[in-house]
Amino acid sequence: MAKIKMEKQKDLQNELLNTISELLDDSNINSVLILVRKTARFLIGNNLNTGENKRLNINEFIFENNLYHSFFSGIMGYFTLLDQLGCIFYAKQPIRNVLKKYSGIPKKEQEVLVGLRNCLAHNYGLANKYYNFSLVDNNENERRVVELAKTKKIQGDYSNKDDYYTSIYIHNFTSLVEDIFHKIKEDFSNNKLKPVIKNVSELRARFTIKQ
């Protein structure tokens, strides 16, 4: 019985590693983690194979092509990737736990990213009762992911005050998510992470799709 359980666990480990690594045996089955990562890269304008920033001038590109919807979708795609990784390895608060362990940024800034994720997911916008967000196309010398607002927003105050705006440096954010993906993959490969997924059937049903 113990041997069978160990074999099933090994099968799950191998299948999950393949799902993360895009090494699925069946060419008609796609990993949704890989799909959402490639889609997010495309919509943001990052290199499809590496995720490296192409250094587009985001604001100019968006205004010229009226592509706010695509740009927001790309950012949301990166948040979805964090959600997916969190759901595989954490039973509760998946995205918060992923950011807590792997982001390397302060807790307050982690909560800001969760707030932006919720804004985009629920309203497809950049404000809620806690935050007003500004998306910044950072230059190569900027290392921050989040710049906190100068003044804490009064809950429910939707007035357009400059001091209320919290800035998200988009290129640094996408680089952060790419880095988190690689760190989680490495930790899992080295048996430092255990999935909360129960079996291969659940993994395939939730995190792969057929063409």
Question: PLM features: what roles do these ranges have?
Answer:
Residues I34-K38, F42-K101:
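Short, contiguous, well-structured surface segments enriched in hydrophobic/aromatic residues
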Residues G104-Q211:
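Acidic, Ser/Thr/Gly/Pro-rich intrinsically disordered interaction regions
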Residues K8-L16, L24-N28, S73-M76, Y90-N97, ...:
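Anionic, Ser/Thr-rich low-complexity intrinsically disordered regions
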Residues K10, E22, E64-T80, Y102-E111, ...:
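Short, charged/polar micro-motifs that form catalytic or ligand-binding hotspots
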Residues A2-T50:
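Surface/interface-facing alpha-helical segments and adjacent flexible terminal/loop regions used
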